[in-house]
Amino acid sequence: MVKPTSSLLQRYKNNVRVDPSTLNHYLCYYCGKTLSDRLEYQQHMLKVHEVMSQSYQLWSDHTMDTLGLIWSESKRSYDRDTSCSLSVPASPMSRESRNRNSDDDYYDYVYEDEKPKRRRIDVEQSRRSVAAAAEKHRKLLEEQRRKAEAEYERKRKADEKKKEKAIKDEEKRKAEDLRKCLQLQQQKTAAAAQIRETAEKAAVARRMSTFEVGESSEQLAKPEGEKRKRRRTESRWREIESDSDKPEVTALVKKILEESKKKEASSQEVEDADLVPELSTRKPYDNTEHVSKLCKVCKKGPHYTFANLFEHYQDLHNATIKSLHYYGFNGNKLIGKKNLIERDHCQRCVIKFPRARDYFAHMIKHHVYESVRCQLDFENATNADVEARMMFRDRILTLGYNFKFEQVADPNLVSDVLEPGQEPSTSAEQEDPSSLKIVKLEEPELEEQKALKPESEAMEQQEDVHSLNPE
């Protein structure tokens, strides 16, 4: 590599006059810059604008020869053998003057001993190699991404299996603990039941032994007069029942026995209610059972009986019964109040009901008269009210009616007889009310009544002696 001489550099620096015929001006058609040297123009096109096609055209054979550069040995031998008539004449400027005029451009100068430029085929090969390398890199990245995803999926599945196994183990542990707890509870319950059963058996044995001792002592201490009174009463009722010549008396006896049983049942199916001060001014209903009524909800009707209206509210409007009351009146004065207790069976018909509403509907339809009539507090009542309160949505519906008792001429009868047609019959035989008014008979005394008067005992002893000695 030959460095430009100092004389050439000094001439450029001192701006030595040059022959105008040797000056050339080159204009850049990209940026408009004007250059006086062809080599500088070519370097400007290559460095600044990178115009390869223009540089290839500008670097002609003559220029290469002028600069002392050759394409190849074959090219130089071909140029020696062939002369070109259209070749550009050689520049009068010496070869030294065409060297670079600056130290910065010195290292960019192309010399003869350097390697030639790469050809187009090398560029294409380099492009293909770059594309192949990029494709290889892309495939490598894709393979790495695929491996990473597979590894992540494998780890995720392994974690899920671990979690499922932990959950199953926890469930098994809880089930085992629950089973052990239930087994222990059953053992404790069985032991407690056995202890309770043993204690109950011991208590029953003690009660039975005490009862046997007390019963034996009571039997020994019973008075002779009470035994004779019981025998006399039982024999008297047996004689009345066995007397076939008096069917009216027999029927009345049966009726009185039924009434006593009904009174006992009626006393068990109701409970007493306090008469609060505001109820003292209560008056009986004006309407009876058979007065037609309209529904207060749908305004439909008329309903000719209280039972039909009650069933209409229950079945059509799904109203629930809240309470059922009996009110006894002596004239217009309130003398008693009873609440019908909710039950799951009827004590008269021995019928069981799945719901309370069925029990109340059955009582209203079949037994309300005898249930009210048999109340002991209503013995002096002349009429009574039956009042039902039903809950419909957010309000309470009050239904009720009044019925009157028949005034019986004989006050010694146990119960008053209703008017014909008011009380539905609950037996197969229908009794004549007139026969019940004529005959008068005392009720059998209960076994619980132990206190007897001295006069009655004396009379019973005389009757027993007379029965033993009829003559």
Swiss-Prot record:
Biased composition (Basic and acidic residues): 140-176, 234-244, 439-456
Cited InterPro entries: Znf_C2H2_type (IPR013087)
Alphabetic keyword roster: DNA-binding, Metal-binding, Nucleus, Repeat, Zinc, Zinc-finger
Cellular component terms (Gene Ontology): nucleus
Gene Ontology MF terms: DNA binding; zinc ion binding
Keyword Transport: no
Localisation per UniProt entry: Nucleus
Span of zinc fingers (C2H2-type): 26-54, 293-317, 344-367
Start and end residues of each stretch annotated as Disordered: 80-107, 132-176, 210-244, 418-471
Superkingdom of the source species: Eukaryota
Name of the protein this chain belongs to: Putative zinc finger protein F44E2.7
Native species: Caenorhabditis elegans
